Amino acid sequence: MADWTEKYRPSTLSEVRGNDKARDAFADWARSWDDHHEAVVLHGSPGVGKTSAAHALANDMGWETVELNASDQRTADVIERFAGRAARNATLGGSAAGGGAAGGDTASRQLVILDEADNIHGNYDRGGASAITELVKESGQPIVLIANDYYDMARGLRNATQEIEFRDVSARSIVPVLRDICRKEGIEFESDALERIAERNRGDLRGAINDLQAATEGRDSIAVEDVVTGDRDKALGLFPYLDAVLKEESAEEALQSAYAVDETPDDLTKWIENNVLDVYDPSEVVRAYDFLANADVWLGRVRATQNYSYWRYATDNAAAGVAAARDGTKGGWTRYGRPQFWSPSDATADEVVGQIAAKSGCSVATARREVLPFLEAVTHHCKPRELTVAMAAAYDLDEAGIAFVTGSGESTNKVASIAEDAQALREERMEDHAEGAFAGGRHAADDLGASDGETTNASGTASSSGDDGDADGTTDGDGSDANDGNDDDDDGQAGLSDFV
């Protein structure tokens, strides 16, 4: 089944909903481009229609498009080879760049679209930001940069471009889009159901369309009760989740099951990819892999940009999409296998993340998404050494775990010595903990011993002294435990202060 966000993508700017001022400013930029030759930045939250507007504008102007998105590597060399060639040289139609506003040259231009311009960084995109800045200054073709956060872009790039903000799409603008899709698909609807979908997506038009498609899969109507408004309270196991997606549940139900599993979307996608062949018929597999390919694109964007809001689109495809590819429910028992391409480093990552989650009192997903990247950053290549030792001791990491977190070689003397020192630190802390636990008993015994030569009065003064010592020891131990419990209360920050 076709992805509705693509099937109903606006073909002209007049069809772009919810951002009339931005749409008009964008059209003005295009019509006057020959006068200013400036690139433009379309910025705003994911799913508000920035990329769709760029393609719609190209249709309106009769321009061809060249697109480089966040799942592509965007080094200086790549940008020059793809976008630079299109921007500086002849168009595919054979016309020279830089023609006048009148005549056929304008219609034969190419619109260069660079997605996620605010997330070009690191070795993966080495030199990309400076190459784009140079490109927009010298371009002979119109360039559109797409960004979520305008101020995450380099200042030089901001200064060299115009900017147009696309705001979150209001629920009252989303509902008509959903209504039009229902009518074109022959789906009867309750207005309250569409309003609930629109409100739940909080300005994300793309997400609302995905939710509508999931909720109506295999149906010819949608009512309020068909729209699930919240996540399930009870965590779902991995194998029940696979049953839900591959055998039992509707697209909407499978999507909610995905939200209830304590795993990240990239791991869930790997499990689905590895097991779908064992459950689906050939025709179903073909449809399922179309959705899995879309999920991989979104996961690529997450890896390239570290923008985890894109995870929801990967989940939409890997869960709801794959479930929608199935013809009815399936019975029987299936031996689900771990992904065959799960490398030793993946296994190490699972073990490390599991230990972090257990020690910190947070979920596996939080440990993988928030705590692990922090640890990797502050202990890169085992520096500073003292902090790395403390981290390894806090999370009970062996040499393989230390090497994985720090990005160092497992067989190096550096990692081995850190593992030894971490073990020594753990033992030292265990001794200190044991001494604290028995300190009260020792104090009580000392006090009782000291009172042997004294006359105990009727009120039991000596015994009271012993009781005071016992109470003091207990208070110290309980205070430590209470602090540990407080660290675990905040799932998002659990574990980060354990050793810093």
Curated annotation (Swiss-Prot):
One of its GO terms (biological process) is DNA replication. GO terms for molecular function: ATP binding; ATP hydrolysis activity; DNA clamp loader activity. ATP binds at G44, S45, P46, G47, V48, G49, K50, T51. The lineage of its organism: Archaea, Methanobacteriati, Methanobacteriota, Stenosarchaea group, Halobacteria. It comes from the Archaea. Residues 443-500 are annotated as: Disordered. The keyword Transferase does not apply. This is Replication factor C large subunit. Part of the RFC clamp loader complex which loads the PCNA sliding clamp onto DNA. Residues 467-492 have a biased composition (Acidic residues). Keywords: ATP-binding, DNA replication, Nucleotide-binding.
